[in-house]
Amino acid sequence: MYYWFMPVSQTLHKARELGFEYVELSPTADFHFWHHYPKADDAYIAELNKAQKESGVKIATLNPVFNWSCVDEEERQAQVRNWRRLLEIADQLDVREIVSEFSGDPNTPRRCEHQWYKSIEELTPDFEKYGIQLHMEAHPYDFVELHDPAINLIRGVNKPWIGYEYCAPHTFHLSDGKGDVERMLRSAGDLLKEVHVADVFNHKAFD
């Protein structure tokens, strides 16, 4: 969550006013932004930690988006570097869960899959060093957009710290228009670690 017209630290106080105890922080330009190196410095992190303490609201998860499945190897390496800094920041904020996306390009799914697994291998020591859990979601326009292939990709990593996040707003993307929520949730099994809940529209209803 964010209120774009106030500093990120202030959103924690706003969350307290609204009755929340935990928040998930999505990309914003002054913290971590889509595909860019995180901009939070020590002072920024200290301000967020102060806000957590004063408000009583805990940053439960971060939701970074980095193109770590990019088929361009130089760009992929840059995105892995972005991830390393993000994980360092998460540790300083005492955030132990991160939700993210596969990214990549749906037009080159096989090559992107290779790159994603390569990035996971390179970042495994970092996730394990900080004791951070990673929950992946299949997202529209990523190299994997459907529920079942995403589950298979996550299972293939075969690490206890990586799981699946089901995003209800993307239900009809995940199911190719079927909307079979119960089947998807059950098929995720023990890999299901987090659920995002919101209204959803079937974009294929009139195809």
Give residue ranges: language-model regions.
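Hydrophobic faces of well-ordered beta-strands that scaffold small-molecule active sites
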Residues: M1, V23-L25, I59-P64, I98-S100, ...
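N-terminal-biased segments
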Residues: M1-L12, R16, P38-I45, Q79
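Gly/Pro-rich active-site loop or hairpin
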Residues: W4-F5, H32-K39, E73-E74, F143, ...
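Alpha-helical scaffolding within the catalytic cores
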Residues: P7-T11, A43-L48, H147-I151, G179-R183
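Catalytic domains of carbohydrate-active enzymes, especially glycoside hydrolases
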Residues: V8-A29, I89-E97
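Active-site acidic/histidine proton-transfer and metal-coordination neighborhood
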Residues: Q10, A51-S55, W68-Y166, H173
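Glycine-enriched alpha-helix->loop->beta-strand junction motifs that scaffold or abut catalytic
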Residues: G19-Y22, G156-G163, S187-K193
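Glycine-rich, proline-tolerant flexible connector loops at the mouths of alpha/beta enzymes
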Residues: E24-Q52, C70, F102-T108
